[in-house]
Amino acid sequence: MKKIISSIAIALACTAAYANTPQLDTLFESDWQWTLSHSPETATTLGDNRYNHKLSNTSLAAARVYNKHQQDMLKEALKIKRDSLSGQELISYDQFVLEKQQAIRAAELYPYTVQPITQIDGLQITLPSLVSQTPFNNAFDYHNYLARLHAIPAYVDGIIEQLQENMKTGWVAPKVIIAPVPGQLHDLRLHLDESEFGTPFHHIPANVPRPEVFAARGKKELSEHVAPALLKLENFLITQYLPACRDSIAASSLPAGMPYYDFMVKNGTTTDLTAQQIHDIGLTEVARIKAEMQRVMDQVGFKGSFAEFTVFLNTDPRFFYTNSDDLLNGFRDIIAHVYQVLPTMFAHLPKAQAEVKPIPLLGSEQQPAAYYNPGPDDGSRSGYFAVNVSNLNTRAKWEMETLTLHEAIPGHHLQISIAKEATDLPKFRRNGWYNAFGEGWALYSEGLGYEMGFYKDPYSKFGNLNDELFRAARLVVDTGIHALGWSREQAITYLNENTANPPNDNQVEIDRYIAWPGQALGYKIGQLKINQLRAKATTALGDKFDLRAFHNAVIDNGPIPLSVLETQIDLWISQQQAKH
């Protein structure tokens, strides 16, 4: 990624600029407003309710408009004199240019959506989830929601058009990740009224006039527009798309070949590491962490093998709740403890408090153990830590501490909330996402548990090590699947033999990596970089090193590429040395 940013600088230096350079904030704001107007779902999740009556245009024509917009924005950015910028303006400028170049490169590989729907990402998951982030405070909100429901058939038609283009061009998904989708659509269609789609009509606020009218209109939209659209997509997948899907699972087997996976690796890690280099890093880290796990097994006096210990951890009743409320409250207790010690780790904290909510049961079996859902920009709702309460016999107590530190605080909630509250940054940076930075920070945060008084129970320590091992194993299996010719069964077996996760979870995870090439690489690569920078700062500053200040130096500027983070921390080290 350093090479990418360097090339940006060279290109800018050679580009003629207008005598009257446009203000950066005008360019950023123009692009941001275009993004919100063309992605109403994004606007809703950020608390901007101007487009709550709409859904994105999912047609091929809309994709071409998007690609043209990225090109136009890059041209406008290159008219600005880069050497006239400094500080945050320069960081923002370089990030903006980089993001546009990445979008343009993606379109060069394939100009439309590569996978418009999968078992982990598609309208059957995203649209119901969107409802929980939509306001229902007055009649206007309900009119907006009815209009959005009415737009679902056109949204589905666009998805089908994208899938048809996939079939024409050979950019079809692997069968294994599409096979569950018709069932997901079927279940949602049969339970629309009790799903998130129908919930707003069961709890209409008292201030909304004639609630029975809205309830009736809602039922009509669901039965006459949403259900037929879902059935149409379900039938299309079964009769046309699924038979055309590929048996191969590697991203490198797509028409663009290995360059496509190389792009996804660069996108997921913001580094220039090759797939083979990442694979080798993963193997080294797996061996190191497994040795630490063996020491925990020795500590608790377990005499069997690693595989036998994982069976014990995943079957002994002492490690599981039998009631979902108890599980949720257990996570809430951990968060309360974290908040007590957080000031010892950070110089300043966000105002927004983390909440815990259950993942909706419908479709939850294809969802991870937990994830983080950010709050809107206006702070009207906190982000929340979503917990999977299905299959309680797989939600182990020994992984709860490390999971909380990752998904909530000081992981995703803390990092994302601080970014959202940094009003001096342009909106695209406050709400941006670099996988290696965000997930790397969250994995690094798990490691902070030792300094915060967690993992005192050896089984919880094993849980933390297992989570780190899991992220290291991802480096092995993601590159194995997409670059080195691994089969799905080989990848599942590797996770089963090298992690303490339940076999069913490992199967779900492998299918996730198949559906989302390169994404799983960011966690470990990002964590290793932050650990490296902390060690560098500690050595350079000695007894002047301030851990609280270091942490805020890492996250106070919003999500950034790892190469930019390294430059930023080098500058911070120099500033600290100058102070002393």
Roles of regions detected by a PLM:
Residues M1-Y18:
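Gram-negative bacterial Sec-dependent N-terminal signal peptides
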Residues A19-H580:
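N-terminal maturation segment of proteins
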